[in-house]
Amino acid sequence: MGLTNETIQSKLTEKFGDQLTAFETTYGMLSFEAPKELNLKVLNFLYDDDTLQFRFLTDLTGLHYPAQTGRELAVVYHLHNMTDNIRIRFKVFTGINQPDIYTATGLFSAANWMERETYDFFGINFVGHPNLKRILNVDEMDYFPLRKEFPLEDQTRIDKDDEMFGRG
């Protein structure tokens, strides 16, 4: 019998108790949230557990939720168990004033580039990263372009009507 979302959630709850929250399954993929201080412990458990075996980091990215005071920035991990062909997603949140998350590069070498990209676009500082610097934008850039701090369109344009896009 293959690995199921119920088994994954049960093992995570058994290990971490109520520290992991917001469990939900969307389109067959289990998602949950973890405190940022636990990101490495959760990743290591998912990787090392003989049943879970989430040994492939599919993606790591950032998100900006400006309305969530104290947890404005999120890091989202997508992991894949190749043996049972099952994927999961989990998020850790941090405040925008001190956006520190522990690096996953010690466990997944692929996290190196993904964390640099996330730093470059969202300003999330990956503590312990071996080479955390901009990777796509110029070094002189003094802002993080994917934060929702900028208008979607040039406000002086008259050829676009925001009402047509549900923003008016």
Protein language model regions, located:
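Terminal low-complexity/charged segments
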Residues: 1-168
